[in-house]
Amino acid sequence: MTDTSFIESEERQALRKAVASWVANYGHEYYLDKARKHEHTSELWAEAGKLGFLGVNLPEEYGGGGAGMYELSLVMEEMAAAGSALLLMVVSPAINGTIIAKFGTDDQKKRWLPGIADGSLTMAFAITEPDAGSNSHKITTTARRDGSDWIIKGQKVFISGIDQAQAVLVVGRSEEAKTGKLRPALFVVPTDAPGFSYTPIEMELVSPERQFQVFLDDVRLPADALVGAEDAAIAHLFAGLNPERIMGAASAVGMGRFALGRAVDYVKTRKVWSTPIGAHQGLAHPLAQCHIEVELAKLMTQKAATLYDHGDDFGAAEAANMAKYAAAEASSRAVDQAVQSMGGNGLTKEYGVAAMMTSARLARIAPISREMVLNFVAQTSLGLPRSY
């Protein structure tokens, strides 16, 4: 999408085509096979990095493509549309890459960004805790000074892909020297650091990327593990959350496209009394409605990414939340309608749609719940009184 039209630039169209052509070599069957064997999608990730797709949004001087969140979300959408959506794309290049590129020191950028860009290094993100989900002000992971070092202690939960990561960006709290009050702070923690451990959470998701509980038991970090200023971490954190929502929306749009593609192919060829079942309005209309909803969500996702890339943080926050909400709802309905349209075949492994039901449902919960988005829109967009 350019500034003057809804037509993507030739460069973006070429990128979309290149990603779609490449990821078709993997597809949903590859993704499901890896998930069911409890294996990582290492080949897919490495090749995405080698081709420049993972780091397309990161600065060129650190090995990235020098583009923006629009381009990275485009990559995410096309991968999801092929049935190979990877949560770590939301985390490593989008959240962490963005925060480090914007607020990291030169040394931090040189150390972490090239690896994130080419896929040789994966960085997880740890914010959620057992008693702190959307209410992130309840985070209890703390960082205290010990000479020039930091000592980190706490627990995190529902952390994606920590077993694939070499480092994790941890959201904790540090003690303000003058007042003793705790304030947010961001730290890069190597996953092989003494005192750092994790255990898997058994989920009903069909995904090669697993979820984990993370334990930080007095993990000692050097002074330069802190990302950004101690007194501005909340701003740094939110700089990574708009990309998170944009990428979540792009993933959901792609999932919706995938499900509709499978369903449409099926109803075009499945015949009852010599007539394709797709000729009946009882099937055609719900699928058409889902297509409309997915396309509308895609437009809002593109708007959010465009606003973000133009530096309109407030406008991007509103649009990113709306995009995430719209895409999650549209994707969930599209997957459900695909299964319904295919009948019993929609629940078989052969057609590969049923496995997406929990993933589509997850999109309505994470990275921010639909209810919290509605709270945000009610308060910020409509100016209604705060409800919590």
Swiss-Prot record:
CDD domains: ACAD. It is an enzyme of class 1 (oxidoreductase). SUPFAM superfamilies: Acyl-CoA dehydrogenase C-terminal domain-like, Acyl-CoA dehydrogenase NM domain-like. The keyword Aminoacyl-tRNA synthetase does not apply. GO terms for biological process: fatty acid beta-oxidation using acyl-CoA dehydrogenase. GO terms for molecular function: acyl-CoA dehydrogenase activity; flavin adenine dinucleotide binding. Its cofactor is FAD. Keywords: FAD, Flavoprotein, Oxidoreductase. Transmembrane segments: none annotated. It catalyses: a 2,3-saturated acyl-CoA + A = a 2,3-dehydroacyl-CoA + AH2. This is Acyl-CoA dehydrogenase fadE12. It comes from Mycobacterium bovis (strain ATCC BAA-935 / AF2122/97).
